[in-house]
Amino acid sequence: MAATLRELRGRIRSAGSIKKITKAQELIATSRIARAQARLESARPYADQITQMLTTLAADAALDHPLLVEHPQPKRAGVLVVSSDRGLCGAYNANVFRRSEELFSLLRDEGKQPVLYVVGRKALAYYTFRNWYIAQSWTGFSEQPKYENAAEIASTLVDAFMLGAGEGEDLQTNNEQSVDELHIVFTEFKSMLSQSTEARRMAPMVVEYVEETGPRTLYSFEPDATTLFESFLPRYLTTRVYAAMLESAASELASRQRAMKSATDNADDLIKALTLMANRERQAQITQEISEIVGGANALADAR
């Protein structure tokens, strides 16, 4: 009985220690989520403006840029998987990996070989453990991505896409560094309680038109619209990668906040249940000790 009581008290102490950790993680995630949301909201006007500019240029430019042209026989599809660097965020990474596997299956059914690029230590560890070939990985900034990080990633992806563009089917098929399509898997932030894992194609690109609220403005371009259009396309792709990373960062923090709150609540419930069991055990122990004392006293009285 004494051993059982010691075990219960040990479990209560362990649950209390875990509760301190989960509560701290919950508070940290709560403090960071507001900044992540602010960064996401502040980046949207820029994304809308560059999309609007690209739309305006597309009205006058000849749309024959390699980033807009479908490959006649696509064989390799680059997939950028955006995960987290740290755990303790519920099913956030599991949902990303599940959506990625669905995309890989779809690409294989279409006769395309997936070429993997990953963001975040969790994706790197997940696919390394499963012996996947990873073309390139980026880690260390999943919670606070910078535009420079997105620019580096987008540059790598564009280089892989452009490597075989226009060079002939044999070169593009045989070159292990080239891809014919680009896709991204990330988590879209909708609210603190709602996030969805998305898989979207980035290249060949389809320009997303932003509807103008007022009269359409006519522009005079210097240099010509086609040159500007070609200059803006890589920047547009960088913006899409950056936006996806900001969405994922906010989603990661929201998932961690919810997961840690749930863990803290569960620890509270466990501590209450164990405390009740310990109290009952202690009461039973005291009752037994009293019974033994009374029994001993009665035995002495009878002996006299």
Curated annotation (Swiss-Prot):
It holds the Pfam family ATP-synt. Keywords: ATP synthesis, Cell membrane, CF(1), Hydrogen ion transport, Ion transport, Membrane, Transport. One of its GO terms (biological process) is proton motive force-driven plasma membrane ATP synthesis. The keyword Ion transport applies. One of its GO terms (molecular function) is ATP binding. It is a peripheral membrane protein. GO terms for cellular component: plasma membrane; proton-transporting ATP synthase complex. It is found in: Cell membrane. InterPro entries: ATP_synth_F1_ATPase_gsu, ATP_synth_F1_gsu, ATP_synth_F1_gsu_CS. Its main location: membrane. Produces ATP from ADP in the presence of a proton gradient across the membrane. The gamma chain is believed to be important in regulating ATPase activity and the flow of protons through the CF(0) complex. F-type ATPases have 2 components, CF(1) - the catalytic core - and CF(0) - the membrane proton channel. CF(1) has five subunits: alpha(3), beta(3), gamma(1), delta(1), epsilon(1). CF(0) has three main subunits: a, b and c. Belongs to the ATPase gamma chain family. This is ATP synthase gamma chain. The lineage of its organism: Bacteria, Bacillati, Actinomycetota, Actinomycetes, Mycobacteriales. The gene is atpG.
